[in-house]
Regions:
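Short, acidic, metal-binding catalytic loop of nucleotide-sugar glycosyltransferases
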Residues: 32-41
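A conserved acidic beta->alpha catalytic loop
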Residues: 47-56, 106
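Short beta-strand/loop segment that forms part of the nucleotide-sugar
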Residues: 18, 40-50, 72-73, 102
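Acidic helix N-cap motif at the loop->helix transition within catalytic regions
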Residues: 25-29, 52-61
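Residue-level signature of catalytic and energy-coupling elements of molecular machines
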Residues: 27, 87, 105, 181, ...
């Protein structure tokens, strides 16, 4: 089927980009909960050819909510980073004012989305005036449920490692629950984004920060997925370790 995209139903509306691969157990409920927040939120799912029928489930939701659900089907498992970039590109070019990202497995609570969007609204509209809002697991104490100790140490250690090398002033550098103002994604040259695993989150934060955008962290509770399989792997960790040094080196020589 052709890709089905979206346009903002109203000025200033937010869209949530959700990448999927074999998320049929949760994606329907996640999308429905986002749509139930209020009439502002749209959803764009980027599916990497899931063999479990995730794309077909989303297409059924799209037919029920044609003005608020979009679907981008990709040919195969092409990676988290490129999935987000493809979704961001459409959302940015379509004119959505606020572009969010989140996981498809309820590790991020959709009910927290309005707080992220509000953090990016101008102060005169009751917001904090930030350019990027991160749903942070570490900004206000430790807020992670059901993670094994090893995974927690790995995640927290990634933050220490990244801050030491890049000076990025964030507690949760690898968080995948965010809201960007459209202007941020318009300023970042997607063709220069080289990360494709979880280091993608670090790279997007670093690029936004070095461009002078304000990033704030909003405390959330992260709950480890209860269905499906984690996409974390040793290769993803190794990529992240390399990419942090690469980002810093390129920034130092003016070739970020």
């Amino acid at each position: 089927m052709p890709d089905v995209f979206l346009s903002p139903p109203a000025p200033g509306g937010p869209v949530v980009v959700i990448p999927t691969y074999n998320e049929s157990g949760t994606i329907g409920a996640v999308v429905e909960q986002v749509l139930g927040l209020d009439g502002r939120f749209c959803v764009l799912v980027v599916d990497d050819g899931s063999p479990d029928g995730t794309g077909d489930l989303v297409d059924a939701l799209r037919r029920r909510h044609p003005a608020r659900v979009g679907l981008l089907r990709r040919a195969g498992k092409l990676g988290l980073g490129t999935a987000y970039l493809d979704g961001f590109r459409h959302a940015r070019d379509a004119g959505f004012a606020f572009i969010c990202e989140m996981d498809a497995d309820f590790s991020h609570n959709p009910d927290d989305l309005p707080r992220l969007v509000d953090a990016c609204r101008p102060a005169e509209d009751g917001g904090r005036g930030a350019d990027v809002a991160i749903g942070s697991r570490y900004i206000d104490g430790l807020r992670v449920l059901n993670w094994p100790l090893g995974r927690l140490v790995l995640s927290y250690g990634a933050g220490v490692y990244t801050r030491a090398i890049t000076r990025l002033p964030l507690q949760d550098v690898t968080a995948g629950f965010k809201c960007f103002r459209r202007e941020v994604l318009a300023a970042i040259d997607f063709s220069r984004v080289r990360s494709n695993g979880y280091s993608f989150q670090i790279e997007m934060n670093y690029r936004a920060w070095t461009l002078g955008f304000e990033i704030v962290e909003v405390p959330i509770v992260f709950t480890e997925r209860s269905e499906g399989e984690s996409k974390m792997s040793g290769a993803i960790v190794r990529e992240a370790m390399r990419k942090v040094w690469e980002l810093r080196a390129r920034a130092l020589v003016g070739k970020l």
